[in-house]
């Protein structure tokens, strides 16, 4: 029976992607409160650069900054993620996104389709809110009840489905945006019970955010980005819609009139409803606890570094069928290698899944011959959440050491991770990722998830 099922699902194919319309980012950011705040903060320091940055190196700042962008958005919120997990922290963020949409903010959510299965498929319920549009990138076929069945149903197209969209963007009004290593879920914000990620993001202001939005638009309008309603069956749509539109068991304050956004209000924890859940499987009490302890970041007072900037992004067709990414010169890795070749003194790499490959090893050999110091921090086997990636790294370990490269592998305890990076919103430590010392998980397992190259 298993073999017959696998053969039958193997014949599944994607529908024609004819239901999508082209759309682009909001094009007048300076007319919004966030855009005006960017200009005001720049004028305060008479900055020559037109982009600014704030490192989000703690779980608290990572969560509160996303809340601040949602709370202060007036025209648009564009989110692009590899994974959005249906848990308490996501419930808080989705409630705020829903409320923003109800006050007239246009929300576009682009997700890689690999993880929208099981409980995490509940995230798609947001599609049925006004002003919300969700697209799924590089989708798999088959039921969302099981990842196994979806993989089996796509085995005939394995060259395509094994390439995933790992971009992570969170953009408000095309004026402020967050990018970095974090997906959305408890493990990325230090509140998962069993395992948390040590991670790193940056909050960007100004012109560079336009580049981030342009990248979002390229993926959003790509032929591999499918509107949710193109992929879900009529029965799936009916079930999701019934769940999404069912009246809550009590009064739902979020369904009453919500006032329009005011220009950058002082940080305050907006109420999270204990009944009007977006994710039916998440405990309302857990979401309420998250909200009460993490108010939005104060955007008026956050420290900023104004500096020239360059955004490097892989093209969407890197994810498509075939080997388009083999064309040199147009990937993020190509850009990073070019920067490394010009390093005069020191290279520091933080990577959770460090598998250098032949071209990077050649670059390392060349710069080491010039006396450039190279240090690499990656996961140990114990801390790695992707053992296959560690196996790939282990094959290069002896050769890396022979080049004189200094290798550091993170241990798997939260105490180590907290000591490495600091747990408070103002603590930097070595600045290599977000501390998880504030997690409710105590001594639970920690895994490095930060991605950074310092040259």
Predicted features by range, described:
Residues 1-8:
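Bacterial N-terminal signal peptides
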